Amino acid sequence: NFKLVIVGDGGTGKTTFVKRHLTGEFEKKYEPTIGVEVHPLDFFTNCGKIRFYCWDTAGQEKFGGLRDGYYIHGQCAIIMFDVTARLTYKNVPTWHRDLCRVCENIPIVLCGNKVDVKNRQVKAKQVTFHRKKNLQYYEISAKSNYNFEKPFLYLARKLAGDPNLHFVESPALAPPEVQIDLAAQQQHEAELAAAASQPLPDDDDDAFD
């Protein structure tokens, strides 16, 4: 069992993402002391069951930062931004700093959500923060279930210390609410891979000029 904290600006799709996992949604518990919903997300691996206790902020981040109680004892994390809203990516370093102040040296996945939406403001090749901080990055679409399992598989492998760990069955997910243009998305992922071999820009802002 691992405590997984999910952070990022309000409206980036954190709650939508967590709710895709149907048994976790069914068994969630509200923790009134810190105002979070905790979803137990089970994944079945070749090494047995792994449960992530997923802490969802329930929108408190709209009123400023999150209290330390949210982060304490976090064993892994997802930082989420919305590829259709540039500001949510610009705020990723702040979320990362807040997280690392309380949780040192935990595996972190950066997720760019809503890649099903046509007019992206944050292009795949503009996402460089994960390279500076040695995080894993995935493009996801919560509403279409695209890449839903990827962040959890990465974190499970890191936490288990086993790069060969794999899921042996898929969790029950809510049916897709939107369709994703897979050909276009594969093009974005190819751009992302190509960008990874380029030197990092000196300044984050120049990617958006």
From Swiss-Prot:
GO terms for molecular function: GTP binding; GTPase activity. It comes from the Eukaryota. Residues 187-209 are annotated as: Disordered. Residues 1-162 form the Small GTPase Ran-type domain. InterPro entries: P-loop_NTPase, Ran_GTPase, Small_GTP-bd, Small_GTPase. PROSITE patterns: RAN. GTP binds at residues 9-16, 59, 113-116, 141-143. Residues 187-200 have a biased composition (Low complexity). Keywords: GTP-binding, Nucleotide-binding, Nucleus, Protein transport, Transport. The keyword GTP-binding applies. CDD domains: Ran. Residues 59-75 are annotated as: Switch-II. It is found in: Nucleus. Residues 28-36 are annotated as: Switch-I. One of its GO terms (cellular component) is cytoplasm. GO terms for biological process: protein import into nucleus; ribosomal subunit export from nucleus. Gene3D superfamilies: P-loop containing nucleotide triphosphate hydrolases (3.40.50.300). The keyword Transport applies. Belongs to the small GTPase superfamily. Ran family. PANTHER family: GTP-BINDING NUCLEAR PROTEIN RAN-1 (PTHR24071:SF33), RAN GTPASE (PTHR24071). GTP-binding protein involved in nucleocytoplasmic transport. Required for the import of protein into the nucleus and also for RNA export. Involved in chromatin condensation and control of cell cycle. Found in a nuclear export complex with RanGTP, exportin and pre-miRNA. This is GTP-binding nuclear protein Ran1B. It comes from Lotus japonicus (Lotus corniculatus var. japonicus). The lineage of its organism: Eukaryota, Viridiplantae, Streptophyta, Embryophyta, Tracheophyta. The gene is RAN1B.
